Structures are given as C-alpha cells and as structure tokens.
A protein has these predicted regions:
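Residue-level recognition of alpha-helical structural elements
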Residues: 34-38, 112, 134-138, 142
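Acidic, proline/glycine-rich low-complexity IDRs
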Residues: 107, 122-196
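Intrinsically disordered, low-complexity regions
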Residues: 4-6, 14, 40-46, 105, ...
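Phenylalanine-focused residue identity feature
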Residues: 9, 16, 26, 38, ...
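Long amphipathic alpha-helical segments
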Residues: 58-127
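Surface-exposed polar/charged interaction patches
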Residues: 23-33, 48-59, 82, 86-89, ...
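Charged, amphipathic alpha-helical oligomerization/scaffolding segments
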Residues: 11, 15-22, 41-48, 52, ...
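N-terminal interaction modules that seed assembly of large macromolecular complexes
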Residues: 2, 7-8, 14-72
Length: 196
C-alpha cells in the first residue's frame, strides 16, 4: 500500500487531478460561454492537461473490480450538445490521424464537441472516483486514466487542439459576427448534471 500512496500523492498526480478538475468545470460551464472565450480558454487548458497527463507516474492496478462510472449517457450528451451549440458550424473538422484514413479516399469528419465530451467523460469519472478518497480506487482510477490517455483521449486532445487553433486563427469569410455569440439561443433549463 506504501507504493500506492506514493503514486496517488505524487506531485505530478496531484497536479493532474487539479487540471482535470478544472477542465471538467470548464466543460460543464460551456453553455454559458461565447465561442471566442471558449476557444481561447480551451487552447490554454488542453495543452496543460496534456502535459500533466504525460507526467503521471507509472502505476499498476491493484483492484480487480471495475471502477464506478459517474457520467451517464445523458450527462455526456448534455456536455456534447452544449459544446456543439457554442461551436456552431465550426464544430466539425477533418480528421487526418484516424486509422481508417489509410483506406479512405474521402476525408473523415469529426466534431470538437464529441472529442471534448469524450475527454470529459473519462476525466469526470476519474475525478469522482478520486474524490471518494479510497487509496486503492484512487490508484486504479489514476492508472486507468493514464492508460486511456495513452490509448484514446490523448490523441483526441491534440487533434481537437488543431481544430480549435484553426477556429481561432483562420480568418474565414463564412463566419459572420452574429455567429460569435452562439450561446444566446440556449434555453433548455432541463439539462442538469446528475452527479453535481
């Protein structure tokens, strides 16, 4: 158990937990943001999240049970829709690092909102398990999150950063000024997070 405590209370682990919690809060507040502010903040928090995830110390699973899942399909969909609403027509981008791209003659379309919601789901489940304060489950959630970063959401994060960079810096004639304040039409008061 000593090794477990060293990993979960390591400086890099604690910093990752802090940034992951900040990311989750940022995504949960997305529906209140204007696109420009949202994109600017995302382009600051995503590289930090990537850096902190890459510094998580090596760890090994110690439990045999699956960890509790906190983010429901409804929660995921609410986050995805909120980000899609903020991004508007700039939510879509062309994926160039998809494995199927080698066999495709046509571009593969992805959505910033789906990528950010996928990252959110993994991190929110991690944060919720970590907040329970049980060393064994904290360790396992950290190990699983590190594994998912390497295999899944790390690549989505950098792909999404590329798309967000394009939204911020690519001057497009298709984008009109009214598009910048997309959240003003958001009026669905039913959407609440079950776990908050």
């Amino acid at each position: 158990m000593e090794q477990t405590s060293q990993v979960i209370f390591d400086k890099n682990s604690i910093e990752f937990v802090t940034v992951a919690a900040e990311y989750c809060g940022f995504i949960e507040r997305a529906r209140d943001a204007e696109r420009k502010t949202f994109v600017d903040t995302a382009l600051k928090i995503l590289p930090l999240l990537y850096l902190k995830a890459s510094l998580i110390p090596e760890c090994e699973l110690i439990g045999e049970e699956d960890l509790e899942v906190f983010v429901t399909e409804d929660d995921y969909e609410m986050v995805r829709r909120a980000v899609a609403h903020v991004m508007g027509p700039q939510d879509d981008y062309l994926e160039v690092f998809h494995p199927d791209m080698a066999y495709s003659d046509t571009p593969i379309k992805k959505c910033i909102s789906e990528d950010l919601a996928d990252i959110y789901q993994d991190l929110k489940d991690f944060i919720c398990v970590f907040q329970l304060g049980l060393n064994a489950t904290m360790n396992d959630s950290l190990c699983i999150c590190k594994e998912h970063f390497a295999e899944f959401w790390g690549q989505r994060l950098v792909n999404t950063m590329r798309a967000l960079h394009d939204v911020k810096y690519n001057i497009s004639t298709d984008d009109d000024a009214d598009d910048a304040d997309a959240p003003s039409g958001w009026d669905n008061d039913e959407d609440e997070f079950d776990f908050l």
